[in-house]
């Protein structure tokens, strides 16, 4: 039974008979505004969690994580709308475009889904040509598989390496059309990839994706975006620590 709902700086507290649930974005709490368009350094995240702990006298070891959303903002070398347009699959799940604003989502299950969107459309006064790639889960099982269980874990810098590695792994699973490269046109045909998924050989899709990226060469757009993410992570990790 739900008893009491309170809010404080973009955090929402719901008191039940047997537990307290806290929902909200730590990034938005830090900004004291409902946006996450700016850079959020790892040290800022840790300091913010400790501040919340102090204000509300929380035992972070008893604050179990059920939902988690993490991502990274980068400025790609092409217009973000063009980048999003050419996002085709994550793993074997197609990217779909809802109507709200310029973003795509792959998967909608509680365990995991990924989102890619144009942050500068969402917050045009705060950033420009900014691409956000994020992972969201509503199951503790996914979070626990990262070795993360409680808010206390998110005050420890080592766990952020696990988080960024998870994010990069999910990006590795993305099929991105790079039409700047002149290769067999079948690779830019969505029907070709659908047929790969329907093939009796269940490995055909992954094998063809590997072949596609090999044909593109090392300087392909997918690889460039990944390297940009890696550089951004190093920047966020090095600042203010």
Show which residues each predicted segment covers.
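Structured, helix-rich domain cores that form ligand/interaction pockets
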Residues: 1-197, 222-240
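Residue-level recognition of well-ordered secondary-structure positions
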Residues: 23, 136, 206-207, 213
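Short, solvent-exposed alpha-helical "recognition" segments
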Residues: 210-225
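Helix-turn-helix DNA-binding segment
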Residues: 202-210, 241
